[in-house]
Amino acid sequence: MKPIVIIGAGISGLQAARLLEIQGANYFLLEKSNKIGGRVQSETVDGFVLDHGFQVLQTAYPEVQRSLDLKKLDLSYFGSGAYVYLTSHFQPFFNPFEKPFAFLRSLGSGLVTAKDLVLLGYVWFRLQRDVEALDGRKETVGELIDRLGFSTNFKSLFLRPFMSGVLLDARLSQPASLFYFYMKQFMEGKAAIPKAGIGAIASQLADIIPTNRIRLEAPVTHISADFVELESGEQLEFSQLILATEAPITSDLLGVSKADVEPLGSETFYFRAKGIYGMEPYLHLMPEGSPLLHFSCLTAIDPHSSLKGDYLFSATSLTIGISSEEIKRILADHLGVPASDFQFIKSFPIPHSLWRVSDFQTLKKEAEKRNIVLAGDYTQFPSLQAALSSGRLAAETVLEKVQ
């Protein structure tokens, strides 16, 4: 029988290949670049492990629990909550459901009001039910936050910056249901970083896949009814095809318009610092409107990430192209330390960190017409959960077809 062919060795493609391998299927995984993982990449610079963009592993995701061995990833965890910048200092906002007494102490800070506490109770009650990531309603996250009636300070200093970081969308124009979905994940799980970097997720998925099943530097240029053609001119026949590429590449390969593909970009900067400056293992949020979205001291999260007494900081902006000197200045000003304490290591501008939620009907209809199975987080919603889920569903679909 002709093999199943998977195009794209990002998380969705790796997940599909992993499950096909478990089922003993005949398949090949094609990847245009020289490495697996897609957007989920890490690299080591001057002894520091740097992720490509600010990426965390959410332990409560059902597909994460189903697919990954979290113990082997050797995770370090962010604290549940965040520090927000209030007037001239950072004020902790602890998860009220994890540290209720510490949270209550913040009521007099000016960040949270008694009404906010009541509204958070409503959100908590809402999260006790099953929460769909996408429920079909047209309301946006920003509109939902305004409608709920939280105080101005709580919205502008915590809710909006926090959700902007989750969605990489300053306008908060993603579906409102994602607000409840992500809040439930943060309430029930933890945000974590693998010791070897976020790229360890891709490596773990690939561990089970024999090297002769993966072909790197094998860009596909054309898809026919029963074969794919590589840039080299080689043709590979297939029985079933899984297209696990990014939405724009999928559009190109299917020959359809990219009109419904809208990327959400970000740039993450890494600095070596002389001190930890009393920072706790929490995300530090900047006020709404700041060119810097958030930052954290990764050494506070994983003390073993220090190199020769130095400390690793990451800082993320939704503005691609902002200078590292500007980011350094903002960091220094808000921590009250000299800018010379920070030494720039590297930045990762990623124009397509995530994709704005769309129904992608043009892509889906064309793929269905040609008997091609799509995979990728864009087919559901932007997250590791959706990438893993879509890869699993794609594998299950093609296995049913070939049986």
What do the PLM-derived regions correspond to, one by one?
Residues 2-29, 399:
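N-terminal Rossmann-like FAD-binding beta1-loop-alpha1 element of flavoenzymes
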Residues 221-329, 333-334:
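Mid-domain catalytic core of redox enzymes
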Residues 42, 46-79, 110-113:
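Conserved FAD-binding subdomain of flavin-dependent enzymes
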Residues 298, 303-403:
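Conserved flavin/dinucleotide-binding core of flavoenzymes
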Residues 21-45:
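Glycine-rich FAD pyrophosphate-binding loop
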Residues 55-62, 133-139, 148, 184-206:
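Short beta-strand to alpha-helix junction loop
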Residues 65, 74-172, 187:
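Mobile amphipathic helical/loop "lid" adjacent to a hydrophobic cofactor/ligand pocket
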Residues 179-227, 240:
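Helical element adjacent to the flavin cofactor pocket in flavoenzyme catalytic cores
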